């Protein structure tokens, strides 16, 4: 019986196997690799590697099915193996045999057979690589001559066929590099025959051949020539690879043996070339040598004798065990429909001949006839080999009868009902008699439109329910005048479009002005989407230029360009040196002196015309020895005194002396908007005395008078400025006192007695200045530069020093100094007057900028700055004949203290700029003295702390008088213009001796900031899950009927109550020199899954023609699963120094509990944090994903009884699973939970329920700059999607145990199980078998692994907005902080048990016995 069943199975398998097509779907690539050191890439040279794509679908292909790939113009496969497997993911789904065409067919083929690994639920696809060599000719056989025309040199299209499907690819073939006019040779190895086909073509004669001899022979006797496989002919040309393309007969004589072959020919026409080819068998296919005869005479040419020898080292196919065997190729005609090549069975140890058969089909002709009937019949009239067979196809056709009826439709329909068992078909014509309809349209949740028609009986009312998906939505965003955003939804009817109108406020606008090359102005507006910023670009033409030329004190010319903003005017200032001056003095009739200056343009000469009144006349009367009187007039130049000397006879005389002095005080003040300038000067202690004794040896009288007029020019500068934004105060006060002392002596030595006069006066000067500045700006930068110059020989200079200090750093400093000397040379006569004028320009520019980019910023700064200034004026003059010496020294100093304190809160960038300008002071003065100043000395005490000391010692005796002065203040920040203040005339008479020492020090000190930060993250997640299930039992009882299929349905309800809670606490501590910051946060989330349902359907098949009684009960039990998830994570970041982070590794563990199995997960993580030195804001993110799977077990019981002795196959499937869940989440952050169950299709008999969940959480913490007074910490939590992939690999083992103590072990690659039970014993009567018990156990080997990787990259943008001293610094730099890689491993042993029992009772009758015996003999 077993043999009979085996034969039946084989018969059914062969009967169901079929030929399929379309498996190969593409040629992905076709590349060449040089397998034999060939000179060019020819199509016939191995190896061409063809990569083909294939696809096998288990729904259309079955094990045993065959498919064939035909490869035209392919000579052979160059692989060493005989077949190739179509493999996907390591599984073989088909095996393909190689059939090389060689010299037998013009194509090669690949015949494939599907194996048992392909099931209906599998679709496999992949690629296969085939090493091949193409056939482009090489012999005179019909196969080679046909294939010699397949390709040409260059680009070709290679096409393969899989049934009706054509696969093509373009490829480039290179032409032969051998000269076609010479002799041509080639050899090809044929693996199936283990022989080489060698070709020899005679050299070319363009006008034809008169005669010739050609052939080849073995050189050493190691090559055997097969004289039975020889082709001789003449070819009309050769192809691109030097192979014959035609073969025609001609006159020749052949001589052939196993050692050589040759022919002698005559009279070959022009355009043709003789050739000869034969099969040879070298003893070594890889190396052999042939000698060639080459004698020929071309028409109208001389006889040529050029024999040659070639050594062949060609390509050999590695066909093991095939050398030295006689191989015979035969052709046989068969009844198949296609041509094939096959190898007959061959045993090397017994058989000596290996036969290759070329199977060619018998040609057939088909005749089609018809008749009235049901079935199509085929009959074949066979024919012997060599004739044509006839196939007669008798096709049936049916007659029809027509039936007409009414129906509720709107059109007339005609339906033909074909009768499968009779030759008369029925044509049903339905005439419309429609019912009225009521149509209802409604929305539903699906994405497509559904129409349901409820048709009532004839003459009733039909209902049409149209279900439409929700309308698509078109969202339009537009601007409006309000300051807030709003959304309006307009809902249309079904099949319409809903509109969502989003109204956004207008974007803010940023305007940028720039120059361009055009002569006109233009404005371009760039509008962005809502919540963006619009840009307005104003392009202005370049400003016009105004050129001003002025004189300056340098000896060279210079040009300065001042560029203003658009729509302004640019200024070009050309500074030229002063012109030389020519002075001319002349008398005039007026009583006063005047000076006229004629100024010319630059590079000219100025003229000064001095007009003086006539000199006064001094009359002197003196005695002389004469007795008469006489008068003498002495005339001097301008500004002199003419003398009239009267000589009288000797008489007595007397003289008088007059001295006069005066005191005066000067003061001046100037007032400007938003600033105050106070300056006062007082001069005290002015006195003079005169003591002039006169004596003479002889009586005499004399008169002496002294008149002194002093005038001087003094240039000085003083300015105070203030700026105010929000609140600003600048105050300044100066106090000056002066003490001057001077002594003047006169003497006369014209007589024997000494006459002298002494005048002494003194005064003191004390100057003091103080300033106070208060401002809310976070940075103040002050720079003052004072300068004045005189066109004569006087100058004024000052030294300013600004020192600013903060608790952490010195931010800025500016020091400038200048100390000139001035010498005034007077005329020879005394007294003298020198006039000069000075115009000085001073500009002070103050700029403060604050940039804040944060939601909330609080800054406090308390810097202090001091300002010291000293100025000196020195003048030196001398006169002759007097040797008097006068020195002048003036000095003043003041200090400024700046203590700003502010608090700033901003939500956007803030920029504050303070421009301030002060310029122009003019003084007019005159001086008449002789003075000297000691040379000052300056030394640098230390270069490291920038300390300088200036020492000088002066002795001053001076007299200064000023007639008028003006001071001018100008503002350029939209102020009130310029203010000119006049000062009254004043005079200073002083005598002073002083030692002055000035020390300027600048010390830059920085207090390092030490910050200590500690971040602790302790998330704790506890999860618990419990579930229980209940199911219903169903049974079906069928008796005494024919059953084809029974459908069982069962519905179970799975109630589940899962809860998950998560607690996360975060604490942060920052310690810095400005204070401590503690911040903390907590996170709690709870998720619960309330209920889900499972729908199960089962199909029981029974195929029997006899009575069957079947009862089935099933009990589905879902294991009680408790899952506990504990997650602990600790992350610590310590910051002990600025901008330096260190981290400690953290550990991550998870423990799952499922029955008695343990699932563990251990993660070791090491975090690396790198920051740049300027990073003060750190963002740390962490992300965790958790998942778990749970499996269920199925317990069932089946019992059945058959009242038949025929086989009955019963298979029960439980296949479909669906799950739905409700979630309730409470969280301060964002927690996502998901639950899903995967349905397993039929026919597996086990149920696999998977429950997975994932949580996603991202935390971001921002730390503010540690350099500011008040640090700020911000924490944010956002949701970050993460994809996590887990792969579970299982190796279950299934064991079945029977009551006869037999056992079987089956390895199954998956958890799919099927059991087929067959009971049949027709020879026993009234046999009862209740002992069949099957136990199925499944053990999952703990070799499962899950690998997951998580890479987290965080980028932080830092902003430093600390306030140090008088300025603000900002820095922004992206920095990659953290990169984490985590690897997890799971080990999860699970146990699933299946138990079943069955019992059967057989009571066969005589009829059943008879049927069984008949079936037995039939099989």
Curated annotation (Swiss-Prot):
N-glycosylated and O-glycosylated. Disulfide bonds join 73-150, 96-112, 205-298, 227-256. Residues 928-942, 951-966, 993-1011, 1023-1035, 1051-1078, 1212-1230 have a biased composition (Low complexity). ALS repeats lie at residues 365-396, 401-432, 438-469, 474-505, 510-541, 546-577, 582-613, 618-649. Glycans are attached at residues 665, 919, 1301, 1326. Keywords: Cell adhesion, Cell membrane, Cell wall, Disulfide bond, Glycoprotein, GPI-anchor, Lipoprotein, Membrane, Repeat, Secreted, Signal, Virulence. Residues 652-752, 864-885, 926-966, 981-1035, 1051-1093, 1134-1177, 1211-1252 are annotated as: Disordered. SUPFAM superfamilies: Bacterial adhesins. The keyword Isomerase does not apply. GO terms for biological process: cell adhesion involved in multi-species biofilm formation; cell adhesion involved in single-species biofilm formation; cell-cell adhesion; hyphal growth; single-species biofilm formation on inanimate substrate. A lipid is attached at residue 1398 (GPI-anchor amidated serine). One of its GO terms (cellular component) is extracellular vesicle. InterPro entries: Adhesion_dom_sf, Agglutinin-like_ALS_rpt, Agglutinin-like_N, Agglutinin-like_N_N2, ALS, Fibrogen-bd_dom1. Each ALS protein has a similar three-domain structure, including a N-ter domain of 433-436 amino acids that is 55-90 percent identical across the family and which mediates adherence to various materials; a central domain of variable numbers of tandemly repeated copies of a 36 amino acid motif; and a C-ter domain that is relatively variable in length and sequence across the family. This is Agglutinin-like protein 5. It comes from Candida albicans. The gene is ALS5.
């Amino acid at each position: 019986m077993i043999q009979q069943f085996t034969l039946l199975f084989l018969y059914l398998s062969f009967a169901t196997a079929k030929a399929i097509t379309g498996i190969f779907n593409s040629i992905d690539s076709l590349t060449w690799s040089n397998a034999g050191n060939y000179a060019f890439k020819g199509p016939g040279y191995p190896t061409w590697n063809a990569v083909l794509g294939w696809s096998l679908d288990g729904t259309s292909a079955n094990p045993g099915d065959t498919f064939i790939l035909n490869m035209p113009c392919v000579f052979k496969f160059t692989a060493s193996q005989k077949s190739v497997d179509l493999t996907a993911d390591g599984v073989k789904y088909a095996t393909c045999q190689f059939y090389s065409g060689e010299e037998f067919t013009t194509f090669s083929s690949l015949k494939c057979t599907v194996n048992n690994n392909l099931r209906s639920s599998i679709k496999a696809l992949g690629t296969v690589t085939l090493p091949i060599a193409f056939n482009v000719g090489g012999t005179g056989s019909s196969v080679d001559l046909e294939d010699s025309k397949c390709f040409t040199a260059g680009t070709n299209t290679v096409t393969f066929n899989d049934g009706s499907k054509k696969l093509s690819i373009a490829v480039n073939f290179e032409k032969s590099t051998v000269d076609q006019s010479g002799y041509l040779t080639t050899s090809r190895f044929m693996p199936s025959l283990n022989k080489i086909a060698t070709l020899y073509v005679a050299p070319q004669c363009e006008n034809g051949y008169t005669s010739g001899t050609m052939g080849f022979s073995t050189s050493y006797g190691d090559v055997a020539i097969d004289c039975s496989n020889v082709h001789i002919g003449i070819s009309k040309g050769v192809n691109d690879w030097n192979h014959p393309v035609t073969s025609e007969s001609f006159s020749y004589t052949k001589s052939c043996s196993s050692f050589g072959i040759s022919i002698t020919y005559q009279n070959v026409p022009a355009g043709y070339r003789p050739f000869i080819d034969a099969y040879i068998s070298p003893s070594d296919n890889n190396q052999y040598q042939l000698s060639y005869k080459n004698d020929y005479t071309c028409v109208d040419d001389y006889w040529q004798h050029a024999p040659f020898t070639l050594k062949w080292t060609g390509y050999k196919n590695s066909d093991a065990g095939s050398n030295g065997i006689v191989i015979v190729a035969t052709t046989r005609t068969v009844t198949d429909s296609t041509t094939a090549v096959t190898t007959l069975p061959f045993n090397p140890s017994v058989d000596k001949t290996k036969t290759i058969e070329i199977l060619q089909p018998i040609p057939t002709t088909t005749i089609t006839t018809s008749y009235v009937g049901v079935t199509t019949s085929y009959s074949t009239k066979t024919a012997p080999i060599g004739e044509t067979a006839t196939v007669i196809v008798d096709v049936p056709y049916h007659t029809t009868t027509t039936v007409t009826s009414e129906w509720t439709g709107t059109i007339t329909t005609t339906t033909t009902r074909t009768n499968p068992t009779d030759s008369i078909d029925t044509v049903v014509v339905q005439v419309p008699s429609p019912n009225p309809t009521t149509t209802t349209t409604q929305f539903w949740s699906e994405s497509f439109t559904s129409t349901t028609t409820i048709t009532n009986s004839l003459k009733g009312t039909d209902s049409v329910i149209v279900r439409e998906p929700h309308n698509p939505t078109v969202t339009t965003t537009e601007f409006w005048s309000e300051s807030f955003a709003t959304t309006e939804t307009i809902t249309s009817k079904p099949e319409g479009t809903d509109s969502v109108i989003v109204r956004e406020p207008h974007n803010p606008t940023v305007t940028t002005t720039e120059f361009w090359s055009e002569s006109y102005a233009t404005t371009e507006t760039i509008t962005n989407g809502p919540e963006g910023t619009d840009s307005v670009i104003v392009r202005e033409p370049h400003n016009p230029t105004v050129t001003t030329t002025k004189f300056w004190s340098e000896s060279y010319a210079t040009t300065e360009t001042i560029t203003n903003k658009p729509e302004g005017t640019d200024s070009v200032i050309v500074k030229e040196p002063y012109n030389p001056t020519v002075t001319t003095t002349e008398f005039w009739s007026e009583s006063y002196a005047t000076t006229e200056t004629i100024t010319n343009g630059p590079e000219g000469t100025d003229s000064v015309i001095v007009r003086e009144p006539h000199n006064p006349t001094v009359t002197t009367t003196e005695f002389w020895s004469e007795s008469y009187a006489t008068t003498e007039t002495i005339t001097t130049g301008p500004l002199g005194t003419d003398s009239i000397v009267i000589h009288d006879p000797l008489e007595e005389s007397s003289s008088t002396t007059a001295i006069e002095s005066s005191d005066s005080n000067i003061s001046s003040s100037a007032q400007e908007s938003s600033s105050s300038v106070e300056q006062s000067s007082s001069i005290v202690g002015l006195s003079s005395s005169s003591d002039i004794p006169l004596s003479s040896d002889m009586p005499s009288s004399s008169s002496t008078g002294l008149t002194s007029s002093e005038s001087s020019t003094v240039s000085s500068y003083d300015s105070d400025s203030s700026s105010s934004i929000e609140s600003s105060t600048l105050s300044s006060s100066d106090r000056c006192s002066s003490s001057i002392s001077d002594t003047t002596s006169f003497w006369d030595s014209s007589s024997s007695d000494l006459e002298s006069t002494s005048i002494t006066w003194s005064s003191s000067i004390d100057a003091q200045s103080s300033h106070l500045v208060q401002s809310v700006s976070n940075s103040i930068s002050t720079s003052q530069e004072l300068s004045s110059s005189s066109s004569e020989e006087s100058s004024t200079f000052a030294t300013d020093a600004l020192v600013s200090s903060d608790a952490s750093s010195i931010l800025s400093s500016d020091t400038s100094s200048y100390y000139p000397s001035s010498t005034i040379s007077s005329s020879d006569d005394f007294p003298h007057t020198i006039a000069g004028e000075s115009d000085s320009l001073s500009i002070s520019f103050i700029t403060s900028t604050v940039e804040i980019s944060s939601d909330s910023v609080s800054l406090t700064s308390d810097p202090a700055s001091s300002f010291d200034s000293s100025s000196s004026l020195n003048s030196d003059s001398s006169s002759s004949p007097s040797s008097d010496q006068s020195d002048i020294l003036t000095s003043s100093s003041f200090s400024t203290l700046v203590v700003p304190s502010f608090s700033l809160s901003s939500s956007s960038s803030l920029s504050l700029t303070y421009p301030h300008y002060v310029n122009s002071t003019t003084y007019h003065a005159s001086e008449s003295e002789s003075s000297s100043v000691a040379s000052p000395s300056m030394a640098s005490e230390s270069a490291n702390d920038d300390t300088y000391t200036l020492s000088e010692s002066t002795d001053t005796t001076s007299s200064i008088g000023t007639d008028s002065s003006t001071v001018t203040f100008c503002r350029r920040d939209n102020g009130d213009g310029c203010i000119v203040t006049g000062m009254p005339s004043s005079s200073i008479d002083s005598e002073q001796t002083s030692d002055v020492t000035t020390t300027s020090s600048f010390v830059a000190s920085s207090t390092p900031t030490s910050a200590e930060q500690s971040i602790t993250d302790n998330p704790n997640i506890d999860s618990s899950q419990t579930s229980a299930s209940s199911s219903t039992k169903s049974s079906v009882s069928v008796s005494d009927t024919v059953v084809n299929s029974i459908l069982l349905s069962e519905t179970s309800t799975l109630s589940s109550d899962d809860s998950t809670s998560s607690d996360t606490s975060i604490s942060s501590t920052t310690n810095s020199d400005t204070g401590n910051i503690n911040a903390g946060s907590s996170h709690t989330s709870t998720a619960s899954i309330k209920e889900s349902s499972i729908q199960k359907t089962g199909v029981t098949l029974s195929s029997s023609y006899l009575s069957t009684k079947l009862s089935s009960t099933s009990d589905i039990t879902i294991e009680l699963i408790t899952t506990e998830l504990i997650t602990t994570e600790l992350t610590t970041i310590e910051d002990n120094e600025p901008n330096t982070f260190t981290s400690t590794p953290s550990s991550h563990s998870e423990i799952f509990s499922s029955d008695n199995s343990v699932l563990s997960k251990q993660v070791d993580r090491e975090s690396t944090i790198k920051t740049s030195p300027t990073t003060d804001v750190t963002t740390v993110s962490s992300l965790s994903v958790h998942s778990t799977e749970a499996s269920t077990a199925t317990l069932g019981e089946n019992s059945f009884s058959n009242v038949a002795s025929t086989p009955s196959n019963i298979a029960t499937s439980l296949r479909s699973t669906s799950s739905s869940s409700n979630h309730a989440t409470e969280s301060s952050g964002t927690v996502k939970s998901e639950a899903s169950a995967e349905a397993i299709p039929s026919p597996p008999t086990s149920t696999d329920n998977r429950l997975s969940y994932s949580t996603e959480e991202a935390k971001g913490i921002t730390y503010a700059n540690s350099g500011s007074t008040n640090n700020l910490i911000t924490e944010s939590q956002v949701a970050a999607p993460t994809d996590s992939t887990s792969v579970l690999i299982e190796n279950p083992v299934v064991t079945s145990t029977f009551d006869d103590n037999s056992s079987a072990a089956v390895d199954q690659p998956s958890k799919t199980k099927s059991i087929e039970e067959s009971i049949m014993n027709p020879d026993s009567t009234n046999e009862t078998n209740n002992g069949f018990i099957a136990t199925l156990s499944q053990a999952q080997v703990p070799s499962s692994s899950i690998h997951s990787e998580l890479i987290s990259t965080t980028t932080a943008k830092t902003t430093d907005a600390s306030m140090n001293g008088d300025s603000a610094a900002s820095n922004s730099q992206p920095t990659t902080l953290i990169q984490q890689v985590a690897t997890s491993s799971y080990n999860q042993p699970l146990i699933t048990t299946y138990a079943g029992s069955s019992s059967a009772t057989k009571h066969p009758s005589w009829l059943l016995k008879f049927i069984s015996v008949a079936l037995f003999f039939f099989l």
